[in-house]
Amino acid sequence: MPGVDISFLKKSGRRTMAAAAVIALLGGCGADAGSEPATTAASTTAPSAATDAATAEFAALEQRFGARLGVYAVDTTSGAVVAYRADERFGMASTFKGLACGALLREHPLSSGYFDQVVRYSREEVVSYSPVTETRVDTGMTVAELCHATITVSDNTAGNQILKLLGGPAGFTAFLRSLGDEVSRLDRWETELNEVPPGEERDTTTPAAVAANYRALVLGDVLAEPERAQLRDWLVANTTGDQRIRAGVPAGWTVGDKTGGGSHGGNNDVAVAWTETGDPIVIALLSHRTDPAAKADNALLAEATRAVVTALR
């Protein structure tokens, strides 16, 4: 069967080239480079020296920005962990979108032609912030194009179409359970899933849980190498995270990430960041405020990233 037509990825330019460079670098490390056994249990390890060094800085950031901040980061080479409120719940928001496409990649190899199928949807199904899908109602979009849109520009209608293919929020949650994540849950669709006031458990995750899920899909053996490489391509091509984790890592690092935003100033970013030598660090930053009208502040996540990098390196 024909492979997936991903010619539209060429529009990503520099990010797509960066993804190729990362994969080439990993490819020099072994036959199944970049893959590690999936360890997806959603819990932190014992506090490490790295966590101790960063805790005061995270608390100071919370005070300065008036936000609650959750952090989980792991240097997958050294095993060092930074954790802060890592098992507390935050709104998942659009961070689900990369995981949802990972779920499809697990069930449908690229060579199957599944991602070439055209999905059609009505004008009535188009929700707010859908910059790609709103222009394609007449033609529909392939599954691959929907994944590209929902990851790289966080198109909400594309996210809902991917959820439909998975059996809705319940099907997505079942996928997370299959990874060993007994914590995260998705209950609603875009855009209602972004309404997560303090104390709400619907549509939530924890920094430790979401980091474990992205680690399993991007670095683990949940996906075969072609599908893992495709997911990395989409994440590295993301255009919505330049002021978050990407702004806090050193020059020369390559970041593949998925952002999210919601009510109460909710602001998230989950990433795999490859150092200049190709060593992967998984970083999950989740945040929110008590004021339902609060605005997100990307500087909080950028500064938290700098603290993570300092503690781990």
UniProtKB/Swiss-Prot annotation:
Gene3D superfamilies linked to this entry: DD-peptidase/beta-lactamase superfamily
Xref: InterPro entries: Beta-lactam/transpept-like, Beta-lactam_cat, Beta-lactam_class-A, Beta-lactam_class-A_AS
Site description Increases nucleophilicity of active site Ser, residues in chain: K97
Cellular component per GO, a single term: plasma membrane
Keyword check for Nucleus: no
Protein's membrane topology: Lipid-anchor
Reactions this protein catalyses: a beta-lactam + H2O = a substituted beta-amino acid
Lipidation (S-diacylglycerol cysteine): C29
Residues that, per the record, bind substrate: S154, K258, T259, G260
Protein name: Beta-lactamase FAR-1
